């Protein structure tokens, strides 16, 4: 949502910001733990995740897989995937299925379970994403990822630097055992996050779309980070590629006005909403609802985020203040697994913090 552009007197601005941040509980980037950081080389075999997996308790990862599948996957889907796992493996795009198979072999999981847990994570990811431009034209991007099973997933959250030819090709935040990305950065090119767009009948749509060779949401995000050479190329790919489900893609670039929220249907874009600072639209806030519709009263994270951004002000926007905005309750809540702030023009400042670590 855009800034109002209304001037706020300095004292009132400070008081309002302090009130909005009162629910943060003193949370700062310095006092909040970050996840482990690993390198994954895309130049080696699909078993490339094994050096990372060796840092984790296999039983913890297996327990997470069992819990997510047990709670999130209907029995009819489980039976269908178990019967058709090998066929599905051939239909889905490389390198993802080969990576999943490599993980399954190491973790002693069936291929069906590996595929299902990766698909289950595509569902029920309630999130807040913000892309914003400061008064000097710098673009910042932040996101909270909210998800159940926090007691396990916080222990399995990692930052990953994906390497090509020994160099960092892109960076992302994910869970151990999950090959997709909901959050990532291509250095000096663009940043991207994904927020779920719940349209109902999710598993039916997913199964039908899979057999049409449509892409899982998080796999397209990772592929775009790997292959798109510019902000514009990323937006085009994310807007046009057929998907297994609806989603919001939030993209930030390196130049002024390079920021959009793409509202996706499975077959293409429903809406593309750009930054327009010259008209007062210096930030965009996307949760899990179409931006042109009112947020539901029972889950309005949008309005508190907008108030916090306006209280912060465009001139004071930074990665640190964006982190504070994402720490305002209920933008930050009991389901928040992690917060990431990033700016493609300053890729070394990519930062993830685990939330609710206790």
Swiss-Prot record:
Tell me any Pfam family this protein matches. CBAH
**Which top-level enzyme class is recorded in the Swiss-Prot or TrEMBL entry?**
hydrolase
The annotated active site, in chain numbering, is 127 (nucleophile)
Name the catalysed reactions: N-hexadecanoylethanolamine + H2O = ethanolamine + hexadecanoate; an N-(long-chain fatty acyl)ethanolamine + H2O = a long-chain fatty acid + ethanolamine; N-dodecanoylethanolamine + H2O = dodecanoate + ethanolamine; N-tetradecanoylethanolamine + H2O = tetradecanoate + ethanolamine
Known Gene3D superfamilies for this protein? Answer: Penicillin V Acylase, Chain A
Identify the glycosylated residues: 39, 108, 310, 334, 356
Q: Which UniProt keywords apply?
A: Autocatalytic cleavage, Fatty acid metabolism, Glycoprotein, Hydrolase, Lipid degradation, Lipid metabolism, Lysosome, Membrane, Signal, Zymogen
The GO terms this record gives for MF are: fatty acid amide hydrolase activity; N-(long-chain-acyl)ethanolamine deacylase activity; N-acylsphingosine amidohydrolase activity
Site annotation Important for enzyme activity: residues: 143, 288
The entry's function note states: Degrades bioactive fatty acid amides to their corresponding acids, with the following preference: N-palmitoylethanolamine > N-myristoylethanolamine > N-stearoylethanolamine > N-oleoylethanolamine > N-linoleoylethanolamine > N-arachidonoylethanolamine.
State what protein this is by name: N-acylethanolamine-hydrolyzing acid amidase
């Amino acid at each position: 949502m855009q800034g109002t552009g209304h001037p706020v007197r300095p004292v009132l601005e400070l008081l309002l910001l302090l009130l909005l941040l009162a629910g943060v509980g003193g949370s700062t980037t310095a006092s909040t733990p970050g996840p482990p950081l690993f390198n994954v080389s895309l130049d080696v075999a699909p078993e490339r995740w094994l050096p990372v997996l060796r840092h984790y308790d296999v039983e913890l990862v297996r327990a997470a897989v069992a819990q997510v599948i047990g709670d999130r996957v209907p029995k009819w889907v489980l039976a269908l995937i178990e019967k058709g796992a090998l066929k599905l493996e051939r239909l889905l795009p490389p390198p993802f299925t080969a990576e999943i198979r490599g993980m399954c072999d190491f973790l002693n999981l069936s291929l069906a379970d590996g595929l299902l847990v990766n698909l289950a994570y595509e569902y029920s990811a309630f999130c807040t994403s913000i892309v914003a431009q400061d008064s000097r034209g710098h673009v910042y991007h932040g996101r909270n990822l909210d998800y159940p099973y926090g007691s396990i997933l916080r222990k399995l959250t990692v930052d990953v630097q994906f390497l090509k030819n020994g160099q960092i090709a892109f960076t992302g935040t994910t869970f151990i055992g999950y090959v997709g990305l909901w959050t990532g950065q291509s250095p000096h090119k663009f940043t991207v996050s994904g927020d779920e767009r719940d349209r109902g009948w999710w598993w039916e749509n997913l199964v039908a779309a899979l057999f049409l060779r449509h892409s899982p949401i998080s796999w397209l995000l990772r592929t775009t980070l790997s292959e798109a050479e510019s902000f514009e190329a990323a937006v085009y790919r994310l807007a046009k590629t057929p998907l297994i489900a609806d989603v919001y893609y939030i993209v930030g670039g390196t130049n002024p006005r390079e920021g959009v929220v793409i509202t996706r249907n499975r077959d293409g874009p429903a809406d593309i909403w750009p930054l327009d600072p010259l008209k007062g639209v210096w930030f965009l806030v996307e949760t899990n609802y179409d931006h042109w519709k009112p947020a539901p009263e029972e889950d309005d994270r949008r309005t508190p985020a907008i108030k916090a951004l306006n209280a912060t002000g465009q001139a004071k926007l930074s990665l640190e203040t964006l982190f504070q905005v994402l720490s305002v309750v209920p933008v930050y809540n009991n389901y928040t697994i992690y917060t990431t702030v990033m700016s493609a023009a300053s890729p070394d400042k990519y930062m993830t913090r685990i939330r609710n670590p206790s």
